[in-house]
């Protein structure tokens, strides 16, 4: 809108030579009243009255978890143990939960379907984490299991 106001001020001052430039073209809304142009504004900056920064924190935590997984996978290979097994169980479950949550957000429509999909997602994530913890406690663990698969 700043461009519109500046171009309209050029027209009112009879400086038509500015329109001979290829970079400046006449704008169709110049015939509007200046008061109307000034009152209709588009704001591209963020809303300073937002309720929370939950989306920003969620995005940041997703990226932090992805970076942590990049370090956790070599650590699982070099230093297999219970701490790394349970860390992998938590990180992989949370990473999968957030990823499938985005699929639900993008592709599931309708209030009842969204509630059912989110409930199913929470149940799947809880069962996945419980299963991985059970596997870590009662069997060889994630790190040793992957090493055994690689040794085949």
From Swiss-Prot:
Per the record, the major location class is: mitochondrion
What topology in the membrane does the UniProt record assign? Multi-pass membrane protein
Query: Where is the protein found, in the record's own terms?
Result: Mitochondrion inner membrane
Question: One short Pfam family name for this protein?
Answer: CybS
Q: Which Gene3D superfamilies match?
A: Fumarate reductase/succinate dehydrogenase, transmembrane subunit
What is the transit peptide's residue range?
A: 1-21
Topology feature Mitochondrial intermembrane, residues: 79-83, 136-152
* Bilayer-crossing regions: 57-78, 84-104, 114-135
Alphabetized GO MF terms = heme binding; metal ion binding; ubiquinone binding
Q: Which domain of life is it from?
A: Eukaryota
- Mitochondrial matrix compartment ranges equal 22-56, 105-113
Q: Which GO terms describe its cellular component?
A: mitochondrial inner membrane; respiratory chain complex II (succinate dehydrogenase)
- Record keyword Electron transport present: yes
Q: Where does heme b bind?
A: 95
Pathway this chain belongs to: Carbohydrate metabolism; tricarboxylic acid cycle
* Annotated positions binding a ubiquinone: 107
Keyword list, A-Z: Electron transport, Heme, Iron, Membrane, Metal-binding, Mitochondrion, Mitochondrion inner membrane, Transit peptide, Transmembrane, Transmembrane helix, Transport, Tricarboxylic acid cycle
In its UniProt record, which GO terms are filed under biological process? mitochondrial electron transport, succinate to ubiquinone; tricarboxylic acid cycle
Q: Which InterPro entries match?
A: CybS (IPR007992), SQR/QFR_C/D (IPR034804)
Q: What does this protein do?
A: Membrane-anchoring subunit of succinate dehydrogenase (SDH) that is involved in complex II of the mitochondrial electron transport chain and is responsible for transferring electrons from succinate to ubiquinone (coenzyme Q). SDH also oxidizes malate to the non-canonical enol form of oxaloacetate, enol-oxaloacetate. Enol-oxaloacetate, which is a potent inhibitor of the succinate dehydrogenase activity, is further isomerized into keto-oxaloacetate.
Family indicated by similarity: Belongs to the CybS family.
On assembly, the entry states: Component of complex II composed of four subunits: the flavoprotein (FP) SDHA, iron-sulfur protein (IP) SDHB, and a cytochrome b560 composed of SDHC and SDHD.
Q: What is this protein called?
A: Succinate dehydrogenase [ubiquinone] cytochrome b small subunit A, mitochondrial
State the organism named in the record. Xenopus laevis
């Amino acid at each position: 809108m700043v461009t519109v106001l500046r171009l309209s001020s050029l027209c009112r001052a009879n400086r038509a030579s500015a329109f001979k430039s290829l970079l400046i073209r006449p704008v169709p809304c110049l015939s509007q009243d200046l008061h109307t142009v000034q009152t209709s504004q588009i704001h591209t900056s963020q809303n300073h009255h937002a309720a929370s920064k939950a989306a920003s924190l969620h995005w940041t935590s997703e990226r932090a978890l992805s970076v942590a997984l990049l370090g956790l996978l070599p650590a699982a290979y070099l230093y297999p143990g219970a701490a790394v097994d349970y860390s992998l169980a938590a990180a992989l479950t949370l990473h999968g939960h957030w990823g499938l949550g985005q699929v639900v957000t993008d592709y599931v429509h309708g209030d009842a379907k969204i509630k059912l999909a989110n409930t199913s997602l929470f149940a799947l994530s809880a069962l996945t984490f419980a299963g991985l913890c059970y596997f870590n406690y009662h069997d060889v663990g994630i790190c040793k299991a992957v090493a055994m698969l690689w040794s085949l």
